[in-house]
Amino acid sequence: MMAFVAIYTVGRLKHSHEHPASREFFEVGNEVIRQAAKTGDLIKEFSPNRVLFPENAIKGEGSPILTLTVWKNLQTLFRFTYSGQHMQALRERNKWFGSHQERQPNYVVWWTEKVTDVSWKEAFKRYDSYIQHGPAPFAFDFKSAFDHSGEKILLK
């Protein structure tokens, strides 16, 4: 059975969209997505335009930056996240993003049989589940990861 992995990320810009730091973030972000597309491992990128965001994603300082993408598998997603330009962007994220609330993860990952089952609504549900119950096969992070059958695995 073919299974894909979805990742939902949540960040909050420190500055307005017009601020040079934010403009730099969008340039870097576009480049990172171009690189992701080139790998052949990125299956789908969802647009955040006209999405009704949940209250917890929008309240607070700074504008929310949310991404939702689907990948071929967990290993390729993990490798992409911690290499190349994306790794560089992670190192510089404090320039662009404010710090996260206690216990609020800035991303959540889950397995899906069908790309068509992935949606923003689904992402918000998985994120809430992670906040309430911690990492589980339903919603997890790279530190506490699960394989497609729900077994704990170590990513490296």
What are these regions (language model features)?
Residues W71:
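Exposed, tryptophan/tyrosine-rich binding patches on extracellular proteins
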Residues E61, L74-P105:
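An amphipathic, aromatic/His-enriched active-site/gating alpha helix that lines ligand/cofactor pockets
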Residues T67:
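Glycine/Thr-rich phosphate-binding loops that ligate phosphate moieties of nucleotide
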Residues M1-P64, Q104-K156:
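Short S/T/G/P-rich N-terminal loop/turn motif that feeds into the first structured element of a domain
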